[in-house]
Amino acid sequence: MMRHYLEFERPIADLEAKIEELSALSQSGGANLDVELDALRQRTEVLRRETYSRLDPWQKTLVARHPERPHLVDYISGLIEDFVELRGDRKFGDDQAIVGGLGRFRGQSVVVMGHEKGHDTATRLKHNFGMARPEGYRKAVRLMEMAEQFGLPVLTFVDTAGAYPGIGAEERGQAEAIARSTEKGLTLRVPVIATVTGEGGSGGAIALAAANRVLILEHSIYSVISPEGAASILWHDGSRAKDAADQMKITAPDLLKMGIVDRIVEEPAGGAHSDPEVMIETLGNVLEKELQAMSFLSPDQLVEQRAQRFYDIGRKGLS
């Protein structure tokens, strides 16, 4: 499968193309090029690490949106055993922009849910590019209530540009559905861990991120509006998205400094899309430790800790 390279990854792409060319030549019996190939691979790895160590906020935004980045279905496949998907909000219908259900995470029964964007044209249309409608958020509430009833921890995975802004969604109460989902997350008497795996866009993201612990992958973003949207409002020019991203404090280090997220999960060199299996395993190890740390808290303590976490936002990192 042909890889998708971002513009700033072009030098890396050129080196990898050269490696493929020499590998094909070597395998055809034309020459022994092992020494040259090893040198090229080392150069590529060094360049990849250097490139990703100095990404600016706009470049991180592009990485967060990378089409080959692992999505919810990949995390479920890699981390959740015996997954049983539950569909529908019992009011209107099912929204595949949010996928959720029951399963076992490293031996522990959990409820898992999150945004799914899709990997190709067909699945992106099926999942509406991860932009949920009201029935998606009401399905999330239904799953949260089930988790509370059976005393199961909740794992959520956030990756959305925002809730779907269509007329039908507004007619069916989009704002109310987002608010109810956020409210339910804040009052659950079980552990809740949210992970921003790509884009965390506006209320559509917060509805699944009212958690005891909010994690974020190293090159993910989390914001009230997209850089393009902010540029359109501030300067009436969406093409100034890079300028907006530089000002918005949407990257993981800035969010951690302000207390909006609690932990940054390191990505493989070259981003999560460069080695999805390593990314999934790394996140699984972090989630396991986070769940263990919360296993000693009572239901009342979980609710209080979660509320206090959000009360404290805005009290640090702003000086």
PLM segments and residue spans:
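Intrinsically disordered, low-complexity segments enriched in small/flexible residues
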Residues: 1-109, 277-319
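Conserved catalytic cores of soluble enzyme domains
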Residues: 158-288, 292, 296
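Short, motif-level signal for alpha-helix interfacial/capping segments enriched in acidic residues
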Residues: 33-36, 136-137, 230
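Short active-site-adjacent helix-start/loop capping segments
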Residues: 70-72, 120-122, 164-166
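Short hinge/gating elements
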Residues: 51, 61-64, 125-129, 270-273
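Glycine-rich beta-alpha loop segments
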Residues: 82, 92-94, 100, 105-157, ...
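Terminal peptide-recognition signature
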Residues: 15, 56, 112, 159, ...
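Short coil/turn segments at secondary-structure boundaries
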Residues: 67, 71, 128-131, 169, ...
